[in-house]
Structures are given as structure tokens and as C-alpha cells.
Amino acid sequence: MNVQGFQKLTLLDFPGRVGCTVFTGGCNLRCPFCHNAGLVRNPVEGANQEQEVLKFLAGRRGLLDGVCITGGEPLLQPDLEQFIRRVKELGYLVKLDTNGSLPERLEALLKTGLVDYVAMDVKSSPAGYALASGSEIAVSRFERSIRLLPSAGIPYEFRTTAVKGIHTVEDFSEIGRWLAGDSPYFIQTFVASDNLLGSGCEAFSRDETEALLNAVKPYLPAARLRGQA
């Protein structure tokens, strides 16, 4: 698998677990607020760290609980399942981060029983998806993934990074209607950096973010904020 880097310790990426995070190269979206621009546009050929990661994990058994696989978009990797099997053989739980654009691959992976937790990014409301994702992938593909997770039998979450200029309060009302139910949902704070895909992205203020949450809550009672100071 094309592993472009890994973080040896995270207390945040895998809820309730002490883990490490593996970053895969390449993505089929071009979200202007993406903070992993290098992984999306220019993954380094020949820089695969898969064996280094597996060796690291072999030496951390009993110290780490799980591995978060993120990107880029991990489901683009043709040998993702094989990598996960090797991680599971070492005794680790596996969390998958995905943008949900590849529902067939997501469904096939879920059926293997290898994944213990899935976090899916919901980029925006259906009407705002093209702007937020920088792509023309049919919204129906993301919706298929959204419908898969509640019946997968494993913990999961939906999450949206809130970005001023990309999202509005109405977008979040529509997201709430789209996801309506008891699914775990997080509105994440946008953090500016020098490694963004686009420009002009700004964070909402705390009060503005609370307004976004209030727009979602009637439809998603479990909605929460993540990353607010």
C-alpha cells in the first residue's frame, strides 16, 4: 500500500483508543480547505513506508490499541485490504477515514469484518458538494456510503469541517435533514495552514460555529462540536 507517512502516537484520531495514524497518498477530491495538499496532489513515488509502519507496529504491541488509516483517500489503494489484514494479524484495531466517494469499495471492505470504526467526511449539503469537494462526483455516490454505515454493525461517525466561504447555516440545516437520525455527527473547526489546496479559507468564530450546530441539532440530536477552544 502507498503509505506516505505515519504519526507514531495519536490520542485523538481513534476515539477512545491510543493509536497511530497512517497516511495514504492520492485523493479523488480537491477540497480547497484540505490540509494534506502534498498527499493529494503530489504523493512521492518510491517513498512507500508500509514496511516501516508494520515493523513499528510489531514493536508496539501492548502499547498501542489501534491504527487510523487516513489520506488522501485510503479506498483508492488497491491493496488496502491486504494491509489491514497484516495490521489485524498484529493484534490492532483499525479505523478507516474516508470521503465516501467509493461506496462499492467501502461496502466490500465492511463485509470482510476487518474494520472496527469508520469516520466519513460529509463535505457539505448535497447542493454544496461540488464547491466543497472540488469535484463533480455524483452526490448519489456519497449518499450510498452514508446509508451503508448505520447498518454496518460497527462504531462510525460523520463529520464536516466548517469553512467560512464554503459553508452557510443553510448548508448545515440541509446536512441535518440529509443525515437525520441518531448517527454520531461532528462539526470540526477549520485550522488554517500553509499546506492547503485552496486559498481564502477561514474559520467560523465560536458563536458562528454554535449557530451551525444549532442548525443541525433538530435533525441530529447527537451532533457535537470538535476542535473548539
State where each predicted segment sits.
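Canonical Radical SAM [4Fe-4S] cluster-binding loop centered on the CxxxCxxC motif
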Residues: F14-N48
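A secondary-structure boundary/capping signal
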Residues: F23, T70-G72
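Conserved alpha-helical substructure of the radical SAM core
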Residues: A37-V67
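Conserved AdoMet/S-adenosylmethionine-binding subsite of the radical SAM
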Residues: L54-G66, L75-D207
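Conserved beta-strand termini and adjacent loop/short-helix elements that scaffold enzyme active sites
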Residues: F6, Q188-F190, L225-Q228
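Short, charged low-complexity linear segments at domain edges
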Residues: M1-V18
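A C-terminal junction/extension of Radical SAM enzymes
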Residues: E210-A229
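Conserved beta-strand segments of alpha/beta enzyme cores
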Residues: N2, P184, P221-R224
